[in-house]
Amino acid sequence: MLDMRQMLICSAILLTLSMGIRHGFGLWLQPMTQAMSWGREDFSLAMAVQNLTWGFAGIFSGMVADRFGAFRVIVVGILLYALGLFGMAHATTPLALLLSAGVLIGLAQAGTTYVVVYGIIGRNTPVEKRSYAMGLAAAAGSFGQFLMMPVEGFLISSLGWQQALMALATIALFLLPLTWGLREPAFAQGQSPRRDQTIVQALREALSYPSFQWLMAGFFVCGFQVVFIGVHLPSYLKDKGLGPEVAGYALALIGLFNVFGTYGVGLMGSRFSGRQLLTCNYLGRSVVISVFLWVPVSNWSVYIFSCCMGFLWLSTVPPTNGTVAKIFGLSHFSMLGGSVFFGHQLGSFMGVWLGGWLYDHTGSYDVVWYISIGLGLVAALFNWQVNESPIERGHPQVSAA
């Protein structure tokens, strides 16, 4: 097993930068579309494809990580990240933007974020410390969102949007040395864990299991909400007459309070069930968004909304992945984690694309906000039905009420 401190430090730095860089892509929406005379739908489609590619590729990166270890997957992911950022900086058509920011960076994220990292943590952490370790890793990714927002805003204002992307590509390459700290000894020696199921059997079992379906549907809602807000909130606030610095502070606050939320939910994982934590999270999101739309828009209403939403932002990730591990075990954990995350990314695709499409056709984001509220209520209902008991193969599941 890996040394736990080494594993958590390397995982934290990797997630800080890989998650942090992508969190700021909304800052590029207006400068890129204005400079290239594109519609918001063009940029939104590229971000939507990025999230969809991330989710779909995550299933396969999980398979490879389960079979051969995460080291090679992460190295390839980092190289693709740098290449995608370079291509995004030099995109001159919507198609080029879609291929670079959409496909390449989507593939990169599948190899450098939670799907792969949580597999390492699950295999190298005692079960009683797993929730804490996953919460700590999620908090690191959240800190990256807080850290990188002002960094990316500064790079854009000082270098211009194109050179800022080139700078981020260089930063991404500095992640390569960290991969040695995540090289699992057994995989490095050509060994892999013994499994009672094939990949196809494990995937078929999970996809036909009601609780996995509920988790996947709930994660769809999570993706819809957070990516819509992350990409379109800056433009929404500008349309409301607020300065660009308000959007920068808002996204930074989301990242900061996400640190507290993800770390806190990791600690609470030993006291409350995953379905309880997830149900409360999705209900809370609907309440927070409803209040935000109800009160007059001001700097302070935006900051309070960002703090509350940030606390709920990615605190779905540790209990969702922890519940998957409880039900199905660790043999195919990275693949199954990638599969449930695919639901998240389907939601991300819909949230970011629908936001741009409805804005271009109605001149407003209001409908998407209302959809987000309704989906939060549906996700709370879905997750309340999850049964976290380890699967008894060959026996039907009884849903928890």
Go through each PLM region and give its residues.
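Cytoplasmic helix-loop-helix junction between adjacent transmembrane helices
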Residues: 101-139
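Helix-to-loop junctions at the C-terminal end of transmembrane segments
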Residues: 57-69, 262-273, 360
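Conserved MFS/SLC helix-loop-helix module at the cytosolic interface between two early adjacent transmembrane helices
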Residues: 56-95
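Intracellular juxtamembrane helix-capping segments at the cytosolic ends
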Residues: 32, 111-125, 315-328
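Helix-loop-helix hairpin linking two adjacent transmembrane segments in secondary transporters
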Residues: 137-187
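C-terminal transmembrane helical hairpin of 12-TM major facilitator-type secondary transporters
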Residues: 254-258, 271-323
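Extracytoplasmic gate region of multi-pass secondary transporters
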Residues: 25-29, 210-263
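Hydrophobic core of transmembrane alpha-helices in multi-pass small-molecule transporters
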Residues: 16, 96-112, 220, 301-315
